[in-house]
Amino acid sequence: KGYIALLGWSLNAVEAAESFDRRYVVVAPDWAEEYCQQHDIPYVPWNFERLNDRSMEIAETLKEMGVDVAIPLFEETVEWAGAINSVLLDNPRLLGQAMLMRDKSLMKRRAQLGGIRVGIFEEAHDRDDIIRFLKRVNQTLLKLDGDPNDPIHVKAFDKAGCLGHRVIRTPDEVDSIPDEESPSLMESHL
C-alpha cells in the first residue's frame, strides 16, 4: 500500500485512511496542527491559499518523506495535488491535467450558480471509459432502443483550442480516437 498525502483537512478522510490501513500524512493549514498533535495524526503545515516562491518546497518535502501520491480533498487543493504529483511521479503533464479539471469544474460551478445549464463531465483514460460515459449519459436521458444517441464531446487534455475535440454519437466512433489523445475530458452535449 502506498504512502499518501491528504491535501486539506477532513477528519472523515483521516479516518478513511486509517480504516484502510494506509500510511498517510495530513498537509493542512496551521490551525489543524494542535488537533493533529493531540490525536497523533501525522501532519505537515502548509498554507494552500496562494502559490509562492516556496511552492516547490512542499513537493520536495513530501518526496523526501517517501510519499507516493498526493490526494486533494477539496477543489482548492486540486491544482496543488497536480503540481506535487508531477514531482512525486516525475510526470510534468499531471499539473496541466489537474489545472484543466479544476478550471473546468470552477467554470461550470460558476455558470450553474448563475442559472446557466451545464453538462456533466468526466475524465477518460481509455476508449472503454468513453463508451461507458456515452451509454450512461444516454440511459440518463431515458433513450429507448432505436432512438438516436445524444452526442458527447471528447477533448484530449494535451491539445489546445479545438484540436483533439470530437463529437461522439455511437460506440463505433470511439475506435477512431487515437491512443495519444488519452487521457481526455468527456462532456455531455447541451
Regions found by a protein language model. Name each.
Residues 39-125, 129-132, 136:
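Conserved N-proximal alpha/beta basic substrate-recognition cap immediately N-terminal to
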